């Protein structure tokens, strides 16, 4: 059997092929379907190792279509790089390392997200970009009108245009901000369409629908969590999910000294951000159905350690609850969070 290491790049990639006779063949090709097919399409079935990256999924599917066995490897798995030169890094060396790791099995396969969840992630990324862009426009418009002694009343982003229209701004000032207002109108419409699509996902997807029963977890956060985790069964417990989302403290230990720092911030940034935002929302609301136990728990932490620490702790708690709901096929039950209830520990 042939073993192939493929070091993927955005525009070009390095290929290292070890034939059945032990000969090494090295090529540099463009990261395009035609080039991959031309080089590897006529070769006998081989095992190909590539690192998880932006391009890895479509490349893996294309190579599998050519009859090869493709492994997408976790780039953080240290033994895969045991043969790598520590001070010299080149694409050719990386491809050789991947080829050798493929031959001896020194790799850990990364989880390959389903097509459905990959498309949902793309929708979430587009929505997030639109929301952030709208926030920049709001900030800029606010700064422009303040320079002229005007102030836009506070309120939701979605109703910002109505608040601006209600102001009797001078003609020259309205002319200056008109291009931004026009762009914001288009953004509002597109964000509304994106939200409608997410609402439909919640209605049609039983898992996301259950996740959305947790206080503070709306359609966007529930969908992002489901799209990031993909399969609850691939995790051994809530602790592993928290670590996967970068919500656990970094640990720097040596000998008898143990030190824990800030959260690791590993994994999907979008899902982690949304969970922390959900925690902040719970901390700030006065009352809500089923949210009192969670908010009370976080408020006690805030009193001792501050609100920022409490928000992250609550995000960790929410992560555990969401995972337990998915794993057990349940819906949120605030009674499980009452003091003395052992199942609450399992859920969180």
Residue ranges and their predicted role:
Residues 1-18, 98:
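Gly/Thr-rich phosphate-binding beta-strand-loop-beta motif of the actin/hexokinase/Hsp70
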Residues 12-35:
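Short glycine-rich, Thr/Ser-proximal phosphate-binding strand/loop in the N-terminal lobe
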Residues 27, 210-213, 219, 224-303, ...:
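Phosphate-backbone recognition surface of nucleic-acid-processing proteins
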Residues 32-47:
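Short, basic/hydrophobic alpha-helical segments
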Residues 46-53, 98:
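Acidic beta-strand-to-loop metal/phosphate-binding motif
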Residues 71-118, 122, 160-168, 257-267:
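Short alpha-helix plus adjacent loop in nuclease-associated cores
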Residues 124-210, 339:
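Glycine-rich, often acidic, oxyanion-interacting loops/wings at catalytic, nucleic-acid
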Residues 301-348:
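Basic, amphipathic alpha-helical segments enriched in Lys/Arg and hydrophobic/aromatic residues
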């Amino acid at each position: 059997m042939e073993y192939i290491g493929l070091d993927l790049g955005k525009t070009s990639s390095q290929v290292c092929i070890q034939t059945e006779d032990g000969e090494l063949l090295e090529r540099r090709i463009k990261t395009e379907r035609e080039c991959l097919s031309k080089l590897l399409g006529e070769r006998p079935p081989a095992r190909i190792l590539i690192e998880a990256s932006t391009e890895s999924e479509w490349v893996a599917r294309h190579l599998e279509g050519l009859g090869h066995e493709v492994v997408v490897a976790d780039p953080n798995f240290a033994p895969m790089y045991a043969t790598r030169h520590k001070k010299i890094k080149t694409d050719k060396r990386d491809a050789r390392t991947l080829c050798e790791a493929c031959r001896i099995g020194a790799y850990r396969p990364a989880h390959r997200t389903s097509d459905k969840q990959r498309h949902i992630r793309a929708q979430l990324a587009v929505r997030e970009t639109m929301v952030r862009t709208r926030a920049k426009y709001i900030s800029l418009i606010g700064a422009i009108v303040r320079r002229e002694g005007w102030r836009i009343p506070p309120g939701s982003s979605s109703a910002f245009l109505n608040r601006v229209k209600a102001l009797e701004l001078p003609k020259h000032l309205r002319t200056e901000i008109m291009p931004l207002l026009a762009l914001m109108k288009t953004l509002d419409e597109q964000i509304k369409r994106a939200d409608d699509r997410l609402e439909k996902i919640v209605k049609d997807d039983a898992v996301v629908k259950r996740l959305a029963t947790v206080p503070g977890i709306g359609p966007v956060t529930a969908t992002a969590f489901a799209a990031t985790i993909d399969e609850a069964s691939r995790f051994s417990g809530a602790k592993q999910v928290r670590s996967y989302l970068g919500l656990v403290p970094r640990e720097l230990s040596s000998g008898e000294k143990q030190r824990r720092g800030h959260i690791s911030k590993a994994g999907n940034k979008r899902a982690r951000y949304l969970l922390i935002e959900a925690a902040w929302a719970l901390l700030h609301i006065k009352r809500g159905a089923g949210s009192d136990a969670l908010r009370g728990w976080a408020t006690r932490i805030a009193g001792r350690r501050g609100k920022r620490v409490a928000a992250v702790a609550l995000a960790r708690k929410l992560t555990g609850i969401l995972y337990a709901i998915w794993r057990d096929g349940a819906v949120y039950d605030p009674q499980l969070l009452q003091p003395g209830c052992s199942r609450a520990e399992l859920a969180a």
